[in-house]
Amino acid sequence: MKKFASKAVAVVMALVMVMGLASFAFAASDTIKVGVLAPLTGAVAQYGNAVNNGVMMYFEELNANGGINGKQVELIVYDEEGDPVKAVTGYNYLMDQGVVAIVGDVTTGPTKAVVAESQADLTPMITASATAEDVTCQLNEDGSVAMVYENMFRSCFIDPFQGSKMAAFAKEQMGAGTAAILYNTGSDYSVGLTKAFEATAAEQGLEVVAVESYADGAVDFQSQLTNIAAKAPDVLFVPDYYSVIALVAQQAQSAGVKATMLGADGWDSVLGVVTDAALLEGAYYCSGYSTEDTREEVQTFVANFKARYDTDPDMFAAQGYDAAMIMAAAIEKAEASGAKAGSDEYRQAIIDALKATDMDCVTGHVTFNEYNNPEKTAAIINITGGAAKYWGNY
């Protein structure tokens, strides 16, 4: 495995110790090392920190209740800054540290960069929020599945599901007749959602009157939004992350766009960065869960998270918590199998247990299909009165 600079090692180890999860007084046989890959700094740090908070809280609760078969879980967290190259460096570092499994990565690009390495090493992984279809499987040019990455799972739903869901919602629930799309050509996430939205829109009879795009990292969308405004669509689908949505919302108003904006789970936390919530009034997006869901699992999680972090948990925190829960349950079964910790047999036992997952989680009941994806309903969120309100599951 590759080594990396001692300064970076010091940063990672400091993170581990600050978390209070690792107890270096334990003998090696008394601990189980689990890695976490997440962007704790950088452009998508809000996602990474939310996921990491959910993961940490679950394992803290688990350790407080005896750990896994009497062993404490030691989390080793690597901040990859949202960079695919740094994510691979982080993966190699975590493997050097002897982790038996990894919760991560958080966004699609870094996760895909790590998959090839983790597949070769048979490292069990679960991502809380990387939604591109080809995170868990390799696709042919026609979009069909060529190969499933047997070691890679996720607790979130996938891009095609979200894009399709929002097109159907626009037609069936909003009564929209026309739609426009503004998407990021440099983002697998954005491109995947766009393709699915277009396909379902065609099936539903929702006419797409304008499709505009921008390069990754763009901050000026005025020209594209002016073109969209001229088409006067009923809805505008913008499948990107919260930092971009905040900019688009502001510029859409000045460009004269009157359409109701629609988005996907990348919008979660957008109200924390937008200059004026009124710019997104009436918008809808799909999410993995809502704090307003009345199920006991949800309300217990929300109460505990708020007590620990003094804020309500967003979707990323909930999916991080679920990813940790699912992985811990699989590790517990591997521990009971008698396989030597860290061996190929042990890793395969974790993977086999992941495939057989059948459990109630915060974001819903989870089983995995043949592509290692959970199939769940989506929570629809409506931004109204400056707040993100739970519309219902759809």
Identify the residue ranges that each predicted region occupies.
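Bacterial N-terminal signal peptides that target proteins for export
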Residues: 1-12
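Extracytosolic ligand-binding ectodomains
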Residues: 15, 24-394
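Bacterial N-terminal signal peptides
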Residues: 12-20
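Intrinsic disorder/low-complexity segments
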Residues: 1-3, 20, 392
